[in-house]
Amino acid sequence: MNVGVAHSEVNPNTRVMSSRGIWLAYVISVAALHVILLSIPFFSIPVVWTLTNVIHNLVMYLLLHTVKGTPFETPDQGKDRLLTHWEQIDYGMQCTSSRKFLSISPVVLYLLTSFYIKYDPAHFMINTASLLSVLLPKLPQFHGVRVFGINKY
């Protein structure tokens, strides 16, 4: 271990999801969100599951697919300033373990939500739209694509 030595990453965003414990922290934060919503007395169980799913997907979309660039001064001469955080993860390589985890977790939450809402049509449509809005940008075909020019600059 090199104490006092700076990291060797040009862009620290590329390896953050591969850090030790980040997946556990992610699961714990989703569970904490669900427990907090459950503690609100006037929410029914289907509403809590739908809110958990929608809030999770909204936060995931905002943090991974709208935030661009890096929060650090990096020596990459601005190569990553037009890339979203999702496009920077694992240096843009597709099908890595971090990308698989971040793609599968909304699906697992969607399946749990669908089960606990007992496939109520209104909740089901909201949850399906929420899932599609967060899964479609993760597809390899959309790497670097800005639909309708949204988030282009």
Swiss-Prot record:
It comes from Gallus gallus (Chicken). Belongs to the ORM family. Residues 1-21, 64-105 are cytoplasmic. This is ORM1-like protein 2. Plays an essential role in the homeostatic regulation of sphingolipid de novo biosynthesis by modulating the activity of the serine palmitoyltransferase (SPT) in response to ceramide levels. When complexed to SPT, the binding of ceramides to its N-terminus stabilizes a conformation that block SPT substrate entry, hence preventing SPT catalytic activity. Through this mechanism, maintains ceramide levels at sufficient concentrations for the production of complex sphingolipids, but which prevents the accumulation of ceramides to levels that trigger apoptosis. Ceramide-sensitive subunit of the serine palmitoyltransferase (SPT) complex, which is also composed of SPTLC1, SPTLC2/3 and SPTSSA/B. It is a multi-pass membrane protein. GO terms for cellular component: endoplasmic reticulum; endoplasmic reticulum membrane; serine palmitoyltransferase complex. The gene is ORMDL2.
